[in-house]
Amino acid sequence: MASKRHVGLNIRKKDEPKAAPIRVSSVFGDDDDDDNVPATATNMASASVIRVQKAAEREHQKAEAEDPTIFDYDGNYDEIQAIKNEKKEEARKADKNRESKYAENIIKAHARRQLEQFSREERQQLREREKEGDEFDDKEVFVTGAYRKQQEEVKKHREQEAEEAAFNDMTSVQKQKLWEIGMGRTLLNDLARDPTAIKQRKKEQKNVRKREDSDEEIDPKPEKSDKKPAEKLKKSIYSDDSDEEKAPKPPQKNFEGDLKPGLNTVSKKKATTHAERIRQRNYTPTPPSSDDEGARAPRARRRTSSPSPTSRKSIESRESGSRRSPEGKSEKSEKAPKISLKDKLKPKKIDKEARLDGLKEILKQRNTEEDIEAARQRYFERKEQGIVVPPL
């Protein structure tokens, strides 16, 4: 039979919770209340917590053994409060006047500002009277004692201000002559220096560095051939050529000299010193005459930069020497006396007179009267132009 349908609003009833099934108690079960309490993390005390509690208990027992009334706070409260009250009374007695920290300075600053204001008002009144002229000369003038006192205070304040201004003016850095002398010297040096000369000097230093780098020893490298090495072709998986057909190339050595049995150590080249670089720069050996001189000349030009004046002189001297006849060389070699090694090792005799002459030459005055006068004239010209400010 079909269920009856109600016409209208059908409200669905909520599902009631099912009642838990009643468990039948066991015959051998215990009905203690402690069995139903769930075991939580708070009930389970760890070993570390127990250890801390035991240590605290031991400390309490020691303290009670020394003083039985140590934890009797209610009994000792009156004594503690009495000690606090005594300290407060001592502080009050020490500060009878109850002087404040900042009030005195604030009052002084306020009085100073008032005096400054009175001084400004007085100046303004004087300017107004000057404008009025003789308009109110026939009127009586009344001056009270308070106004006179105020005028005296304003006068003292003005004197104090003048003293402070004079002291600050004397101790200011701008008025110190030593500072001005130092500043004037640096200013003169900066003006005397020509900026173009400084730039030129920097360029010369750069050129010298480049020349030193270019004149360093260049290792003879093999000529680069235009032919590129044949690229290795990847072996195809379909090729029938065996690996044995292609003989492996021996490894190429990466150092100079012949291979020897054992460990072939490569000797590191020592870094050239500054003196050696100068020697290399000044020394240019004459190449032997050969057919390929024309081919080597452009390479040498590329490697070496513009020759220095010292190197040019050395080249000219060598060329002039090479032009001379071999007979002259033989004559010179015959005339030159041979010096033995003992004579070379003997200490040289010092000529005191020659040494004194050299010292006098070094220490003699180089500025003539004309140079000093010219420098003096230049200084006066700069002074007239306003470049040099004389120290006052």
Swiss-Prot record:
Keywords: Coiled coil, Cytoplasm, Nucleus. Pfam families: NSRP1_N. Residues 1-73, 113-169, 187-357 are annotated as: Disordered. GO terms for molecular function: mRNA binding. It is found in: Cytoplasm; Nucleus. Residues 76-132 form a coiled coil. Disruption phenotype: Early larval arrest, continued gonad expansion and shortened lifespan. RNAi-mediated knockdown results in continuous distal tip cell migration past the midline during adulthood. In a rnf-5(tm794) mutant background, increased severity of the distal tip cell migration defects. Residues 54-65, 113-132, 149-160, 205-238, 313-357 have a biased composition (Basic and acidic residues). One of its GO terms (biological process) is nematode larval development. GO terms for cellular component: cytoplasm; nucleus. Required for the cessation of distal tip cell migration at the end of larval morphogenesis. PANTHER family: NUCLEAR SPECKLE SPLICING REGULATORY PROTEIN 1. Belongs to the NSRP1 family. This is Nuclear speckle splicing regulatory protein 1 homolog. It comes from Caenorhabditis elegans.
